[in-house]
Swiss-Prot record:
This is tRNA dimethylallyltransferase. One of its GO terms (biological process) is tRNA modification. Belongs to the IPP transferase family. It is an enzyme of class 2 (transferase). ATP binds at G2, P3, T4, A5, S6, G7, K8, T9. One of its GO terms (molecular function) is tRNA dimethylallyltransferase activity. It comes from Shewanella woodyi (strain ATCC 51908 / MS32). It catalyses: adenosine(37) in tRNA + dimethylallyl diphosphate = N(6)-dimethylallyladenosine(37) in tRNA + diphosphate. Its EC number is 2.5.1.75. Keywords: ATP-binding, Magnesium, Nucleotide-binding, Transferase, tRNA processing. It holds the Pfam family IPPT. The gene is miaA.
Length: 296
């Protein structure tokens, strides 16, 4: 695991070439078909060397939750173990890792009618008004959910209206944790400036590889819109807005790079509090040897 642009995929492929393991992707963008360039999806050559499970398993118009991931990942783990191989989970979607390792809380399924009502209230009174409501029913969640985060804010209120219990109450109840021994590694540059540089260079490479054209093709599909989870992936949202005419090309690039840096910061915040984690430095020649030592 590790922040975006830290070298996870390259190390994982090197591990597959040296050890009897099989990769399971832990990435909420790689699950979507047709979102290849902007998600830094492994290319055909890389997939030929090291096939990845749980990529290209959903259309961008479809939803996919942490619960869906846990179900799919557990099945993939069992299948890989049955072949006498080691499952190698690789990615940066920390909520997926957490769901797999710790289990999930029994949260109610989404209710379209309640969501529509919440959206109407937001359009009428504003998200700050709904955030004030959340402070009354779930102050702990209100403390960590920003008023400018409508997806999470709406979900917290929706959970309470469906169940009569706060998100904080329900998340204290967990299902069974992962029934396997796990060795965990995080890879990241020691220097934050180096990570920021890698992020900027990778986004410029994506642009040269046809990222704008990829998003333009997605926009042509009538069932896709900017508020879908798939289109909220970093880079895609900013490019979609650029194609809408919301701002110029240079501003799009700047906003996408900033959004990706913010994602990396959130990922690192998760990882700094992660238990039983072995840290690797991006680009270090000893990374492969270090991981293989734990595999034998």
């Amino acid at each position: 695991m590790g922040p975006t642009a830290s070298g996870k995929t390259a190390l994982a492929i090197a591990l597959v070439e040296q050890h009897n393991c099989e990769i399971i992707s832990v990435d909420s963008a790689l699950i979507y078909r047709g979102m290849d360039v902007g998600s830094a999806k492994p290319n055909a050559e890389e997939l030929g060397k090291a096939p990845h499970r749980l990529i290209d398993i959903r259309d961008p118009a479809e939803s996919y939750s942490a619960a869906d991931f846990r179900t799919d990942a557990l099945q993939a783990i069992e299948e890989i173990l049955a072949k006498g191989k080691t499952p190698l989970l690789v990615g940066g979607t920390m909520m997926y890792f957490k769901a797999l390792l710790e289990g999930l809380s029994p949260l109610p399924a989404a209710d379209d009618e309640i969501r529509k009502q919440i959206q109407i209230e937001a359009d009428t009174y504003g998200w700050n008004h709904l955030h004030d409501e959340l402070k009354q029913i779930d102050p702990v969640s209100a403390e960590r959910i920003h008023p400018n985060d409508p997806q999470r804010l709406s979900r917290a209120i929706e959970v309470y209206r469906i169940s009569g219990k706060s998100l904080t109450e329900l998340t204290k109840i967990k299902s069974e944790p992962l029934p396997y021994d796990v060795v965990q590694f995080a890879i990241s540059p020691k220097d934050r400036k180096q990570l920021h540089l890698s992020i900027e260079e990778r986004f410029k490479l994506m642009l040269n590889q046809g990222f704008v054209e990829e998003v333009r093709s997605l926009r042509e599909r009538s069932e896709l819109h900017i508020d879908l989870p798939s289109m909220r992936c970093v880079g895609y949202r900013q490019c979609w807005q650029y194609l809408n005419g919301d701002y110029d090309y240079d501003t799009m690039v700047e906003k996408a790079v900033v959004a990706t840096r913010q994602l990396a910061k959130r990922q690192l915040t998760w990882l700094r509090g992660w238990p039983e984690l072995n840290w690797l430095e991006s680009g270090s020649d000893s990374n492969l040897t270090t991981v293989l030592r734990h595999c034998r």
